[in-house]
Amino acid sequence: MKTIRVSVVTPDGPVYEGDVEMVSVKAKSGELGILPGHIPLVAPLEISAARLKKDGKTSYVAVSGGFLEVRPDKVTILAQAAERAEDIDVLRAKAAKERAERRLQSQQDDIDFKRAELALKRAMNRLNVAGMK
């Protein structure tokens, strides 16, 4: 079966590099499935799991926003943060989730609710992806 090259890159460096049969991501416009030979495309990404399918197996990468660039022979995910499912520290992700929930529940005026909501989404995404490995 044909494959397409995938790179998941963050400001800290590469997270994933390999050839897969299909890439599935959640863009702002909805769910996208990319196969080899896909038309060129650039799309902003949601905080979600990128699913990388090869040989009947699926690998998961927690992606915290960013952009997807598709060319017929290559997919690049430029993310603010990304972690492979097997690399996620579940205890750290749970602690981040609890911190974000406490910030959202506090009644202080100086709390930036949008930032706290994003932190909660990122932590929940990491926990969900860690459970997929």
Curated annotation (Swiss-Prot):
GO MF annotation terms: ATP binding; proton-transporting ATP synthase activity, rotational mechanism
InterPro entries with a match to the protein in the record: ATP_F1_dsu/esu_C_sf (IPR036794), ATP_synth_F1_dsu/esu (IPR001469), ATP_synth_F1_dsu/esu_N (IPR020546), ATP_synth_F1_esu_C (IPR020547), ATPsynth_dsu/esu_N (IPR036771)
Primary localization class, coarse: membrane
Membrane disposition: Peripheral membrane protein
Subcellular location: Cell membrane
Entry's Gene Ontology cellular component terms: plasma membrane; proton-transporting ATP synthase complex
Functional description taken from the UniProt entry: Produces ATP from ADP in the presence of a proton gradient across the membrane.
Family per similarity comment: Belongs to the ATPase epsilon chain family.
PANTHER family xrefs: ATP SYNTHASE DELTA/EPSILON CHAIN (PTHR13822), ATP SYNTHASE EPSILON CHAIN, CHLOROPLASTIC (PTHR13822:SF10)
NCBIfam families found in the cross-reference section: ATP_synt_epsi, PRK00571.1-3, PRK13446.1
Name by which UniProt lists this protein: ATP synthase epsilon chain
Naturally occurring in which organism (per UniProt): Geobacillus thermodenitrificans (strain NG80-2)
Record lineage: Bacteria, Bacillati, Bacillota, Bacilli, Bacillales
Gene: atpC
